[in-house]
Swiss-Prot record:
GO terms for molecular function: GTP binding; GTPase activity; nickel cation binding. The keyword GTP-binding applies. Facilitates the functional incorporation of the urease nickel metallocenter. This process requires GTP hydrolysis, probably effectuated by UreG. The gene is ureG. This is Urease accessory protein UreG. Homodimer. UreD, UreF and UreG form a complex that acts as a GTP-hydrolysis-dependent molecular chaperone, activating the urease apoprotein by helping to assemble the nickel containing metallocenter of UreC. The UreE protein probably delivers the nickel. GTP binds at G10, P11, V12, G13, A14, G15, K16, T17. GO terms for biological process: urea catabolic process. The keyword Nucleotidyltransferase does not apply. Its main location: cytoplasm. The lineage of its organism: Bacteria, Bacillati, Actinomycetota, Actinomycetes, Mycobacteriales. InterPro entries: CobW/HypB/UreG_nucleotide-bd, P-loop_NTPase, UreG.
C-alpha cells in the first residue's frame, strides 16, 4: 500500500516549510515520516527543514525543479515520483511523506496521482481579501490554513472577514487559523492528520 502522501502548497513565505517542520516535530514519536521540498533553483527549504526540524537529513529530499515549480507537482511529477520511490526503498517503514511545492500562486494544485491529500496555506499578511479570491489551491485542498494570525492587527486584516469568506468557498471542507511561530492552532492540523488522513479512529476501533 505504501506511505500516505500529503501535498503542502501555498505562496512564497506563507509558512509551508515551517508547517512541515511543526507537524513532523509533533508526530515524530508516533509516525514514520519523510519530506520532499520543491524549488526552482535551490534546495534551500530542504536545508532549513534539516537544520531546524527533527527529521534525519537522509529522510529529506530537495528537488530543484527548474522553470515553473507548478509543473513538478501537477503536469510532470516524474522528479517527485522518483524521490518518493527512493525514500520508500530506503525506508520501508514510512507512513507519511510530505511533498512541499515551490512557492506558487493561488491556482496551483497537486496531481491526484502524486498525493493522497493536500494542504494549502496562506498568510494573513497577504490581505484579508485573499480567501475571497477563492483560488483553486484554496478550494480543492483537503485542508486550508490561514497562517500568521498574529500579524492581523499590523496589516489591517480582519480575521472574522477571512473566516466568513473561507466558510463560503470551503462549504463543508475543513479549514483552520494558525500562528505556527507559537504553535497556536497546530492542534487542529494534527487532529485532521490523525483522524482524516491516518484514520486513527478506525485503527483503534
Amino acid at each position: 500500500m505504501g506511505p500516505i502522501r500529503i501535498g503542502v502548497g501555498g505562496p512564497v513565505g506563507a509558512g509551508k516549510t515551517q508547517l512541515v517542520e511543526r507537524i513532523t516535530r509533533a508526530l515524530i514519536d508516533e509516525v514514520s515520516m519523510a519530506a520532499i521540498t520543491n524549488d526552482i533553483y535551490t534546495i534551500e527549504d530542504a536545508k532549513i527543514l534539516a537544520a531546524n526540524g527533527v527529521l534525519p537529513e537522509e529522510r529529506i529530499v530537495g528537488i530543484e525543479t527548474g522553470g515553473c515549480p507548478h509543473t513538478a507537482i501537477r503536469e510532470d511529477t516524474s522528479m517527485n515520483d522518483a524521490a518518493i520511490k527512493d525514500l520508500v526503498e530506503r525506508f520501508p517503514d514510512l507512513e507519511l511523506i510530505f511533498v512541499e511545492s515551490g512557492g506558487d500562486n493561488l491556482s496551483a494544485t497537486f496531481s491526484p496521482e502524486l498525493v493522497d491529500f493536500s494542504i494549502y496555506i496562506i498568510d494573513v499578511a497577504q490581505g484579508e481579501k485573499i480567501p475571497r479570491k477563492a483560488g483553486q489551491g484554496m478550494i480543492k485542498s483537503d485542508l486550508f490554513i490561514i497562517n500568521k494570525t498574529d500579524l492581523a492587527p499590523y496589516v489591517g486584516a480582519n480575521l472574522d472577514v477571512m473566516v466568513e469568506d473561507a466558510k463560503t468557498f470551503r462549504k463543508n471542507k475543513p479549514f483552520c487559523l494558525t500562528n505556527l511561530r507559537t504553535d497556536d492552532g497546530l492542534d487542529k492540523v494534527l487532529e485532521w492528520i490523525r483522524h482524516e488522513v491516518m484514520m486513527q479512529d478506525l485503527q483503534e476501533a
